[in-house]
């Protein structure tokens, strides 16, 4: 009986993580509160895996009757619809704040502004275009290459972004912030489970691609963490979104450059 209760508790945490990252409805019995959200960080990578599988499925079905370029676009649209452009919004806000603010206070204020500025629009456009082009090249090489890239990119990018929670300082004091509960007292075993989901996905790739991707994302994480500390002294929910988008692009770049060689 206790084993069943523990299993249901973990399933509840997975659904909490899914409700945080996506627009997918969760069962009515799921309990969502700050404490559950804090513990659900261990499953952020698995939610990324789910999102990647959905995008990969949309692409695979679409490419059966449509050109690869359109199929990839539909897969990207599916990702945006599933997540509500959660991470893309964070990227745009981060670009606006870092590009338009001089002081830490200015940057945080601009990032909280819901209006889209020129830096945000430019960064969002460039990242989306780059993701589309990279995925199209992979799809033209092999549909399965694009499928693998979508699954790996969505999963690993969320592992990288979420891992920053465990080492960086959360810098917003606003109690209404959606990300604040996940920043409180993270446990080491949560980090291990998060990393394990990333390692599981790396095993899908060939040995060289997996190794290069691991090293690349490790370096990206170090650079992003240092950059965020320099800019605002730590991280916010918006910078985690930016980290996810940047890491996703890096995944596609590495898989295209190394995984197909």
From Swiss-Prot:
GO biological process, one term: cobalamin biosynthetic process
Cofactor(s) the protein needs: Mg(2+)
A Pfam family of this chain: CobS
InterPro entries in the cross-refs: CobS
GO cellular-component term (any): plasma membrane
Keywords: Cell inner membrane, Cell membrane, Cobalamin biosynthesis, Magnesium, Membrane, Transferase, Transmembrane, Transmembrane helix
Recorded GO MF terms: adenosylcobinamide-GDP ribazoletransferase activity; cobalamin 5'-phosphate synthase activity
Enzymatic class: transferase
Pathway: Cofactor biosynthesis; adenosylcobalamin biosynthesis; adenosylcobalamin from cob(II)yrinate a,c-diamide: step 7/7
Membrane topology designation: Multi-pass membrane protein
Residue spans crossing the bilayer: 12-32, 46-66, 67-87, 120-140, 199-219
Catalytic activity, reaction form: alpha-ribazole + adenosylcob(III)inamide-GDP = adenosylcob(III)alamin + GMP + H(+); alpha-ribazole 5'-phosphate + adenosylcob(III)inamide-GDP = adenosylcob(III)alamin 5'-phosphate + GMP + H(+)
Keyword DNA repair among UniProt keywords: no
Family stated for the protein in its record: Belongs to the CobS family.
Biological role stated in the UniProt entry: Joins adenosylcobinamide-GDP and alpha-ribazole to generate adenosylcobalamin (Ado-cobalamin). Also synthesizes adenosylcobalamin 5'-phosphate from adenosylcobinamide-GDP and alpha-ribazole 5'-phosphate.
Protein name per UniProt: Adenosylcobinamide-GDP ribazoletransferase
Origin species: Shewanella frigidimarina (strain NCIMB 400)
């Amino acid at each position: 009986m206790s084993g069943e209760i523990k299993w249901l508790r973990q399933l509840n945490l997975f659904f909490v993580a899914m409700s945080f990252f996506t627009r997918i409805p969760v069962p009515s019995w799921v309990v969502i509160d700050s404490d559950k959200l804090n513990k659900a960080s261990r499953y952020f990578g698995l939610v990324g895996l789910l999102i990647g599988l959905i995008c990969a499925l949309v692409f695979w079905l679409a490419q059966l009757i449509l050109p690869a370029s359109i199929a990839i676009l539909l897969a990207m649209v599916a990702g945006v619809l599933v997540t509500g452009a959660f991470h893309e919004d964070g990227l745009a806000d981060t670009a606006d704040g870092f590009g338009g603010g001089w002081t830490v206070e200015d940057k945080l204020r601009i990032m909280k502004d819901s209006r889209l500025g020129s830096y945000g629009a430019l960064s969002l456009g460039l990242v989306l275009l780059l993701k589309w082009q990279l995925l199209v090249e992979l799809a033209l090489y092999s549909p399965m290459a694009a499928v693998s890239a979508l699954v790996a990119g969505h999963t690993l990018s969320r592992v990288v972004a979420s891992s920053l929670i465990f080492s960086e300082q959360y810098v917003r004091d606003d109690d209404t912030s959606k990300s604040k509960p996940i920043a409180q007292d993270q446990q080491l075993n949560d980090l291990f489970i998060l990393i394990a989901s990333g390692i599981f996905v790396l095993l899908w790739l060939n040995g060289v691609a997996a190794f290069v991707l691991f090293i690349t994302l490790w370096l990206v994480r170090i650079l992003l963490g240092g950059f965020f500390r320099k800019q605002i002294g730590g991280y916010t929910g918006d910078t985690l979104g930016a980290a996810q988008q940047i890491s996703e692009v890096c995944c596609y770049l590495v898989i295209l450059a190394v995984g197909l060689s």
